[in-house]
Amino acid sequence: MELFVISPDLKFNNLTVAPDSTVSDLIDHFTVKNGVSLTDFYVSSNGRLSRSNDLLQSGVVYRLEPRLCGGKGGFGSMLRALGAQIEKTTNREACRDLSGRRLRDVNHEKEMAEWLKKQADREAEKEQRRLERIQRKLAEPKHYFTDTNYEQQCHDLSERLEDSVLKGMQASSSGLVQADEGPSLKRANPTDSKKKAKKKCYWTGMAGLEEMASSSEGSDDSDSEVSPSTSGASCSSGFPKPVVSAHKADPQEQPSSSSPAQRKHNQEELQKRDKEECTSEISSSSSSPAANNEKLNQEETNEISSSSSSPAPKPTEVNQQEMETEMECTAQISSSSSSPAEHSEEEVQQTAERVEKMAEEVQKTAEEVQKKTEESTAEISPSSSIPEEKSQVLSQVEDPLDLLSVSGPEQLEALGLERLKKELMERGMKCGGTLQERAARLFSVKGLTPDQIDPSLLAKPSKGKKK
């Protein structure tokens, strides 16, 4: 029987075998011929594997192929691990269903439908909670008092309160009855000769209240126009006050049992004396303006001499005080002119002219005082506190600086930042820093030539600008 065999070396052989031969006989023939192992080859025909006990057919092509060497393996384990991971995943929202829609969108639609179904239930629960909260707030707290001692104390306190109120009402009613039965002492009889003296007040600043109160009650309308206190204050504010007579003693020294008529008489005398003093001062000041000017000049010199130790008064305050005194004196003159028996209209006009002249003189003197105070303050300047060494250096600012004549950095500090910077730049040194640093740096090169200067003090050469 004749058949065709393709050997492992790709040779096409025509082989004649016995009719009952099998596939194993074919393999033995080639292994014996080539000297290889029987287990290293297998036979296939028409692309199918032939078994070892199959009979050979005539005219069929058989392929003798060697077996491949086995590897390490492991690819199957890798496939098994990957399959396990694929099976473990639970997020399949990125997948699509049969209609092509994302599972994520489908799930969201289902969740939204369920949420809308439960919306009414949620609103009902919310309203129920709100009503319960309101009921809890409106519910009144229930207090149960079971303390017998506390109840007994409250009962005792109420009884004591009633007793104390009754006693107080009885005491007040008895006091009112006694006050009604006694004589009325609200107003004393002025004709009573046995009038008791008032108790003297020794409070500070309250000494003349009794006399002022009694004088205001007994004074007439004409007397109330000009009071002694205002007239005395007006004259004493602008002019030196003369010695007061014995009638102006302390009201505490006078007997409190003096009659109203005597007090009225004393008040009239005081008013007359004050008017006479004011008119005499006005006439004397108008008759001798030169003397007043001399006194004012002396006062100005005294003020200027003391201006270095104490600040000068403001001219506005002086003018205000002088104008107040003038207004008060003119008011007194006008009030005194109301009585035609003492002054005539001509005298009033003369006094008014004199007052105007005095006002002009006072204004002039105030301007002179202001000028002198300004001059004195200008003379006393902080420049006087500068030491002599610094003043010498300041006088030589514009001159070329000679370091050999400088005794210390303190003198160089007086030159200022700009001058020190200029001197340092001329020597090629660093010109930055504070005033003290610049002065110390400049003083450190005293008596040194440019070659002897420390290189750390020199400025770095400036680099040219790149074009």
Swiss-Prot record:
Recorded GO CC terms: cytoplasm; nucleus
Coiled-coil blocks: 107-143, 341-381
Bias (Basic and acidic residues) ranges: 265-278, 353-375
Top-level taxon of the source organism: Eukaryota
Cellular compartments annotated: Nucleus; Cytoplasm
Keyword Lipoprotein assigned: no
Bias type Low complexity, positions: 225-237, 252-261
GO process terms (BP): cell division; DNA replication; endonucleolytic cleavage of tricistronic rRNA transcript (SSU-rRNA, 5.8S rRNA, LSU-rRNA); mRNA cis splicing, via spliceosome
Residue(s) at site: Cleavage: 71-72
One function term, GO molecular function aspect: DNA binding
Keyword DNA-binding carried by entry: yes
Boundaries of every SAP domain copy: 412-446
Domain notes: The PIP-box (PCNA interacting peptide) motif mediates both the interaction with PCNA and cleavage of the SDE2 precursor by a deubiquitinating enzyme. The SAP domain is necessary for specific binding to DNA.
This protein's name: Splicing regulator SDE2
Organism: Danio rerio (Zebrafish)
